[in-house]
Amino acid sequence: MILFLCLIILFIITILFFKKHKTVNKIINFPSPPRLPLIGNLHQLSQHPHRSLCYLSHRYGPLMLLHFGSVPVIVASTAEAARDVLKTHDRVFASRPRSKIFEKLLYKSRNMASAPYGEYWRQMKSVSVLHLLSNKMVRSFQDVRQEEITLMMETIRKSSSKPVNLSKILSSLTNDVICRVALGRKYGVGTDFKELIDRLMRQLGTFTIGSYVPWLAWTDWVSGLEARLEKTANDFDKLLERIVQDHEDGDGDKTDFVDVLLAAQRDKSFGFDIDRLSIKAIVLDAFVGGTDTSSTLVEWEMTELLRHPTCLKKLQEEVRTICKGKSSVSEDDIQGMEYLKAVVKEALRLHPPVPLMVPHQSTQDVRLRDNHIPAGTQVIVNLWAVGREAATWGPDANEFRPERHLESPSDFRGQDFELIPFGAGRRMCPGISFAVVLNEVVLANLVHGFDWQSIDDETDVAESIGSVIRRMHPLYVIPSSTT
């Protein structure tokens, strides 16, 4: 009897499911893989959804419709599909969907990266760009970058040709640079600061069943996810509150980003009100967007160079020729290093630190390739798939070959859609200049100052799980000083 009742309930739920989504299927006619009742296509996503979505796109096309539970999601997987979303219909798809993860960890999406498109987002972006991320501000941080790179090189040199955890060293470097330019001093010494950032970044990539299947939201509580998110949010808020309080108490002899925000709160110099939660949310953006992503890129660059010793030798020859007789590489030296820039582009193509762009959401009805897309539809651009598209990059699209960029004018600043690791359009990452200059000068100094030997399996390119895709295992290497 109980089994019979369960079957009836399941039958009714299935009928309601297909009735509810019949309209969506008629409106959005992009190819779509078969889905299951209630969960949609969620069962087809692996721990690395960028890979799963890429493989599905090979069968269902560059613009395909999936259902994450009850939520229809369009996935763009080629350069032209990305152009349609991020350029042709940029304004329409400039907003963000609501997310339990963002609500919990990012001050209810009050930060710039996850805020809905509108006046608040424009205000937060203008503040961050003007006072932290503009080319002028990035140049003003040159001494900080050089000082921290010098400390990093000294740390490596002290290893005396013993194995070092380069992943850990790079993470410390980027954290310290971000802390100094945004907060005025380091906060990672003698604290669990770095562990907290790692936890935050892992959880930002966590899947919450309740966001897509509302009637199963209780499973997030039973699994302990709700409690873990709450703890991370509280721990980070305590840290940010301490940082803000330190600045209010006048702890520091130079004006930094937090000081600017607090001054604007007092005298309303921005022309709009900015409250304490918004200040903490903007500061949080600096860590979310600038720490893991920056260290991860250098980590993948070194991984690929060690796997391709001919490329490493070629890069070292270029850097050491240009910087002959110098003890280190300056940012001015970088300008003439064409092969270095090609290596950076190739690493960004194969290993975009954030392989799936933060989901976009349409603010109004729109026609996308002759399909009517209703307002509120989510769109995900798979940067990992775009960077490995054979039609664009050729039959060796999955191979690390920096030389391809010496033969191509393509750049990663949002105009060439075959290479958009920082996104494009209105929601493009505003920290691109900050990230690129740090990455180039760090990589150049590493290959200039040391010869490198891997102690790991050189074929190991296993990926971690999370919003930022790092190596699954830390990169251990043996450096040999050249000076």
Curated annotation (Swiss-Prot):
Any one GO molecular function term: iron ion binding
InterPro entries xref list: Cyt_P450 (IPR001128), Cyt_P450_CS (IPR017972), Cyt_P450_E_grp-I (IPR002401), Cyt_P450_sf (IPR036396)
Subcellular location per the Swiss-Prot or TrEMBL entry: Membrane
Membrane topology type: Single-pass membrane protein
Major subcellular location class: membrane
Enzyme Commission (EC) number: 1.14.-.-
Any one cellular-component term (Gene Ontology): membrane
PANTHER family reported for this sequence: CYTOCHROME P450 71A2-LIKE, CYTOCHROME P450 FAMILY 71 PROTEIN
Protein known as: Cytochrome P450 71A23
Gene field: CYP71A23
